Amino acid sequence: MKKTGLLAVALMGLGCGVSDPTSSSHYTDIVRTGYFDSEMNVSDWRNEFVSREEARIDLKVLDSLMTYHYAYNEADNLDESSVLQAISEQLPERMRVGDFAMQLQKALALSIDGHAPRIAGVNEAGERERIEDNPPGQHYFPFELRSTGSRIVAFDGVRRELIEPEYPYVAKIDGIEISEWIEAAQSIIVDGTSQLRWHRGARQLANIGFLRMEMYRASSDQALVLFENHDRSSQVERMVELVEASVAARERYPFAEDARDRIPEDIAYFRIRRMESDPDYIASFAAWIQDSRRVRGVIVDIRDNGGGSRLPLLTLLPHLLDVDSEPVVVNAGRLKLSPGCPGPGCEAPEEGYLANRFMLPIRAIPEGTPERMALDEWLPGFTPQWSPPAEGFSDWHYLIVGPDTDPAFVGKPIIVLMNNGNFSASDIFLSALKGRNGVTLLGTASSGGSARQNEHILPRSDLAVRLASMASFQASNSRLYDGVGINPDIHMEPEPGFFVNASDLMLERAIELIRESRGGSHIGR
């Protein structure tokens, strides 16, 4: 939320040697530099330089982008002009692009936009590489560290073995509680839900070199790790030799073949690792639905699914609605428009601005149709958590889904496996299914995000920044997706053996719930 004058004015003042000596005092960690002073690969984009003048130009561009293209400019506590001015005041004559990227990442991490900031440069392969995925640091753990939702498991992702089978959880590193290390990682993680911050913070644990920087601790090629058992009654301490490159594979567990081996024949299982839009994939999903008509129950596994397309939802949801039921409103949103839109040369399309999200304005939904009648009935109860300003945004758009003419899963128990790795289109998927007859969400709360991200390139540093362009709301409760997320009906975390394919207690519980169900309704509620 902008609370001060335009950054351009502030920068003009700086050019005359006038500045407020206290204006950057609250942003000490954000304006910090020196992350990339050690010897680096000369071809690494983070090793390049940007001058003070070039950086200030990019800061002015970013300030304008935040004002005119960021959907949550008035919804969060980010005072972009103030923080960008603080960065500008502290700029050296020239700096590493990596340091500048870290400053921008930390600044925009004050927002609620789960898709932001994702500051990225171009790597040797010509691909965009996010600084959040490759922050500074020269020391890494030689094994994977993954979150169950509240605890951290250490394992070898190649051999699929726990590092300490009797003590699978990491309790402390260098004598410091694991939660404090995850808190240190929050400097580059957006101010979203607690589960999003924990999930993304846990992903940074492997880069212990970076976290030591954030905690102002000395660098070392070793780390003292305290492992503990399940009930925390016994612990063992190990000195771990660190490595110079990350071994984290960022796999999305479980692998489909691992899970299918555990599924009985009378239960249908489908693993959605990503919300795909590929026609062949969607066709195979639709075929699976048809082939599963005679099963006793259904398990849809979206654990670690970080989003993608809404097509899997549009393929499945019609088969969960009774053929005689009304369509359901799933999502409501308004798009942040470019200056001057709508207007001459920038007229509003008849189908609206969000057709690629399968969302339509009310004018594009004919009166008398089932979709329009469902919308008219739903609208009086819609009280958005935050109302976007009238100026600068499109009309409201809505995602409405109706039943299939021959729904396959009505009357069957449907268990959806979820976790805090679910985000974006997966949040839409979960919110649309939550509360439907026969559907039970099992796992941990999703991260929370839906904002139709747009990528913008800063002209002098060539850094990319992604910003939310849509204020997106859950139809079921009028709340935003960003900063909220979706809660499960039954909370359950995975056990350590899940990460090495030794067991899957969540999947076993889903099978039990189906076995216990007589009609699929009200499981776990």
Question: Locations of the language-model features?
Answer:
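C-terminal motif of bacterial Sec signal peptides marking the signal peptidase cleavage site
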Residues: 14-15
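Loop/turn elements at helix/coil->beta-strand transitions in domains of secreted/extracellular proteins
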Residues: 265-267, 294-298, 410-414, 437-440
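Short, conserved helix/loop micro-motifs enriched in His/Cys and acidic residues
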Residues: 403-417
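Extended C-terminal subregions enriched in glycine
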Residues: 413-435, 440-448
